[in-house]
Amino acid sequence: METKQFAVRLLVLLSVAAASASWAAEATDAKCAGMSPDLTIDRVWGASRVKFDALEDKKFIYVSYYDADRWLSVAQVNKCTGEVAKTRVASRFGGWDAHNSIVLALDKSNRLHVSGNMHASPLVYARMDAPDKLAGLEAVRPMIGSDEVQATYPYFFRFMDGALGFSYRSGHSGDGEEFINRFDNAGWVRWTNRPIFAPTSEKKPVNAYHTNYVRGPDGFFHVAWVWRENYFVETNFNVNYAKSRDLKTWQNSAGDVIPLPITPRTAEVVDEIPERSGLLNNIRLGFDEAGRPVISYLKFDAKGATQLFHARLENGIWKTAPATQWTYRWDPRGGGTIKGEINFSGVKVSDGHLIEQVSQPEIGAKTLVYDDKSMKVAEALSPNVWSPSPAVRKVKAPNGAVPNVQVVRFENMAAHESKESHVVTWFSLPADNRDKPRNCDNAAVPCDFTSDLILHTDRRSP
C-alpha cells in the first residue's frame, strides 16, 4: 500500500515539475524578444576576401571580423534580447593579405578564445578572463612563448577528452614547422616536444599543407597533406596520410609508428605526384559509410585537364581514381592567395550516400553523389542537398564585390538544443590581388571598401 501511495505521490510531483518546467520555458520564451531576422552587427573591412568566424553557445553568438578601421574585433550577440556588445583586440589588419584568417573557440569553462591576423608574423591570441564577458579579449598574449614569431594558419580543435587544442605553422611557406598546443585551466602547454611536420628534407626546405586533424569513427585522429618546396603553389608534391589516437604518437595506415617530425622520406605516400602536376593544397579528408578514410584532391589527368581525385584505403591499400571527367584545366602559378576556380568540401555520408559539395566552371555549384564501389559521380544534385542553408535576405552585391557567408556553428551545446540557425554575411572584393595592395586608379569600387556585417536568423520548423 505504501509503495502504491509513494508511486502516486511521485507521479503527481513529476507532473507538477513537468508543468512548471513547461510554464517556465513558455515564460522565458515570452520574456525573450529574440533577435531581428537580419541584425546588422558592424561595418567591416571588405577590401580583402579574408575568412571571419562565428559560433554560438546557449546564450550568445560570437562573431570575429576586421572592422571598418581594420581592427581585429569580436561581437557578442545576446540570443534573447538581440543586444550587441563589441570589443577590439589590440591587433590591426594590414588590409590585403587573405591569409590573415580569424578563428574562434570556447573552452570547457565557456571562455572565448580568438586568434588571427598573422602570416609568418607574431602570434596574435587573446581570450576572455571569465565566461560570458568580453573583458580580456582586448589584450594580445602569448600562448607558450616559443616558436611564436612567424605564425600562420591558426586552427582550434578538440582533443578526445574535450580539451581545447590549437595548431599553427611556425615559419614560412616551403620552410615551416607545425605545432600543437593544449589548453587546460592553468593555461596552454606544448603537446609534443617536436613539431608534427619537418621544415626540411634532405637539406632542402619543405612545408606540409595539411587538413584539419579529423576524428574518425575508429577513435583515431586522421590527417592528410601535401608537401611544398617553396612559396610557389606549383611546387606542391605527393599526397600523404597519418593517424594518431592522442596527437603525440603518429602511425601510418598499417599501424607502424612514424617518428616526429614527419618528413617526405618517412611519410606514408598515398599518391606520388611530382611538382607542377596540378596538385594544390586544398586537400580534404572524410570517411565513407564503412568508416574508411577518403582523401579528395586535384591533379591533372593524362590529357592535362584538372580532375577531382579520390584516394580511399581499401584492405590496407590506397586506391586512387578520378571522380570527374572535366575538360577544364586550372593551373595556378606563383605565390599569394589564389582565387579559387575549383572548390570542394571533402566527402561525407548522408542518408546512406557518399556526397561532396563541388564548384567548378563547367558545372557550377553541385552536390555530387558517388557510386560506393567505383567512387565515380553517379548523380549531380543541388548544392543545398549538402547542407540546407538558412533563408537569407537577398541583397544585391555592390559593383565589383562578392558575397561571403559564414555559418554560425554550435559549441558547448548540441544542435537540437537550438530552435534557430544562423549565418553571417558580408561583401568583399574578390581574392584576386594575391595579398598585395590593390591598384585603385580605375577600380569599380574604392580600395577601402567596407560592408555591413549582418547576422541572419532562421527559426526552424517544429
Question: Where do the language-model regions lie?
Answer:
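Extracellular, repeat-based ectodomains that mediate carbohydrate processing or recognition
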Residues: E26-P462
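Bacterial N-terminal signal peptides that target proteins for export
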Residues: M1-L11
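Bacterial N-terminal signal peptides
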Residues: R9-A19
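Sec/Tat signal peptide C-region and signal peptidase I cleavage site
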Residues: S20-E26
